[in-house]
Every structure is written in C-alpha cells, then in structure tokens.
C-alpha cells in the first residue's frame, strides 16, 4: 500500500491547492467588479475632454498645438501598461508580443524607441529583453491615482515637446468582456483626428482665459486621462484574466483529483484482492 499512501498524500496536496485557487478566483471576481466601476467612471471624462479640445481647436483654427502637428518619425515613444503580479494567464505575454511586433516594424523603418514602463512585469521583461527605458513606475495598487502617473507621463510629453521623440503611443490591454482581453497599441500624440458627431452641431462659446491657453492646458490633461484610463482598464483586464486562470486551475485540480481517486481505488482493490488470494492460498495449503 506504499503506492496508495503516496496517492492519498498527493490528493490531499491537490485539494489544498484547489482551495487556494478557488479563493483566488472569488477575490479576482470582486476586484474585477470594482475595477469595472472605476473604468466606467473615468471613461466619460476622457471622452468629454476630447470633445472640448475639438471645440477649442475649431474656435482657434490659426493656432495648432504641438500635439496636433504630424512630423517625420525618427524616434517613437511607448507608454507600456503591464501588471504588477502574475497568475493572470497570458495577459502580459500577449501584450509584450503585440508591443515587440510594433517595435520591430518601427525599427525596420529606422525608428529608434524610448519606453516608459508601468508595472513590475513590464520592468522585468525589458530588463531581460533590453530597451531604452527612460521612465518606470510600479506598485500602483488596486486603486491607482492619476497623480501617481503624472511624473512618468510628463517625462514622455516633455520628450515630445523637445523633439526627442516624434510619436507617443500607449500599449495596454483592453477589457472587452470577462472572457476577452485585447492587447492594443494606440497613438496618443500627435492627436489622431477622429470624426466627432458632436462638432457638427456646435455653438460659439466665450472662453476665459482665451482658447489657446485652455487648449495648452487641456492637451496635457487629455493625455494624462488617456494613460489613466489605460491603467484602470488594464487592471480590470488583469482581474478578469486572473479569474479565468484560477477557475481553470480549480477545474483542472478537480479533474486531477478524480483521476487520482480512481487510481487509488484500483490500487486499494488490487491490494485487497492480493490479501484475499494469500489467505485463500494459505487455507488451501493447510
């Protein structure tokens, strides 16, 4: 029965792990719901500020903010939003694959790369993979604040205004639903023109201070809000991916326990049969 004892020990160990993964799944569900609420709360601000920027740009067409001016790209910047913790399936791996693909496409065209990394997993990846990381921040927690991001974002925006980079993009996971998280690379500056239905029926406004000053201030706030939105959405995607990963781990543990229980029962049955055979054989000899 030595084999049976080992199997019993293994079953007990897997059951213990199953309890942990089940608890982690429940925690991830709770955190994901809170992250979804933060994501939904921050989205209207980012959308509205873009509309206001559109109105301001129309009100002052002779002035073009540097964030609106396209120029030849010799050096590109990326703000990479990753997670601080693992156990979330292929979330970070898929993100890095999408990023590396985009970086390689740029490098083939002779474009150099600067990186701002948010999250411990991103920092670890670029320590191994290599890359010119000019700013990094991690351990933002479950409820990140936009104030925590301002310093790192400013490094990249200053680089753009000084002409050290010619394009800035944010790389993060989009929360599609609880089952789907999509890695995306989105251009932040220069601002990509998008058709805005609200601007087709706009009114004339009086601006205080003037439209140019407001536009200068709002442009920076807009980029900060977009990065914050990416961080919040990536957090929701992380919790969803962790929930799925822990559910799969719990289910796999259950399947493994069933298999081991069957093996244990067969081993025990074989041992009992052997004992009976020995007893019967001994009685016959007598």
From Swiss-Prot:
Q: Which Gene3D superfamilies match?
A: 3.40.1380.10, ATP synthase, gamma subunit, helix hairpin domain
Subunit description: F-type ATPases have 2 components, CF(1) - the catalytic core - and CF(0) - the membrane proton channel. CF(1) has five subunits: alpha(3), beta(3), gamma(1), delta(1), epsilon(1). CF(0) has three main subunits: a, b and c.
Its recorded name reads ATP synthase gamma chain
GO MF annotation list: ATP binding; proton-transporting ATP synthase activity, rotational mechanism
Compartmental location: Cell inner membrane
* Bilayer disposition of the protein: Peripheral membrane protein
What InterPro entries does this protein map onto?
ATP_synth_F1_ATPase_gsu, ATP_synth_F1_gsu, ATP_synth_F1_gsu_CS
Q: What does this protein do?
A: Produces ATP from ADP in the presence of a proton gradient across the membrane. The gamma chain is believed to be important in regulating ATPase activity and the flow of protons through the CF(0) complex.
Any one biological process term the GO annotation gives: proton motive force-driven plasma membrane ATP synthesis
Classification via Pfam families: ATP-synt
Q: Which family does it belong to?
A: Belongs to the ATPase gamma chain family.
Q: Which organism is it from?
A: Pseudomonas putida (strain GB-1)
Quick check: keyword ATP-binding in the entry?
A: no
């Amino acid at each position: 029965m030595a084999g049976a004892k080992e199997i019993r020990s293994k079953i007990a160990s897997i059951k213990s792990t199953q309890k942990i993964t089940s608890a982690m799944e429940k925690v991830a569900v709770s955190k994901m719901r809170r992250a979804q609420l933060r994501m939904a709360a921050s989205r209207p601000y980012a959308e509205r500020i873009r509309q206001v920027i559109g109105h301001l740009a129309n009100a002052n067409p002779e002035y073009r903010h540097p964030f609106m001016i396209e120029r030849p790209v010799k050096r590109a910047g990326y703000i990479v939003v990753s997670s601080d913790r693992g156990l979330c399936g292929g979330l970070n791996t898929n993100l890095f694959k999408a990023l590396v693909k985009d970086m390689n496409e740029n490098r083939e065209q002779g474009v150099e790369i600067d990186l701002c990394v948010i999250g411990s997993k991103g920092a670890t990846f670029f320590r191994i993979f290599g890359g010119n990381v000019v700013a990094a921040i991690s351990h933002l927690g479950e409820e990140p604040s936009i104030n925590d991001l301002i310093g790192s974002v400013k490094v990249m925006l200053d680089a753009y205004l000084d002409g050290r980079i010619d394009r800035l993009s944010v790389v993060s996971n989009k929360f599609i639903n609880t089952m789907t998280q999509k890695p995306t690379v989105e251009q932040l500056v220069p601002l990509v023109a998008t058709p805005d239905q609200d601007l087709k029926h706009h009114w004339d406004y009086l601006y205080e201070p003037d439209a140019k000053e407001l536009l200068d201030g709002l442009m920076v706030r807009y980029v900060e809000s977009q990065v914050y939105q990416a961080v919040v959405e990536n957090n929701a995607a992380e919790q969803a991916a962790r929930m799925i990963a822990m559910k799969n781990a719990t289910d796999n543990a259950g399947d493994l326990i069933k298999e081991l229980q069957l093996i244990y029962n067969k081993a025990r049955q074989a041992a009992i049969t052997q004992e009976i055979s020995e007893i019967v054989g001994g009685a016959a000899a007598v």
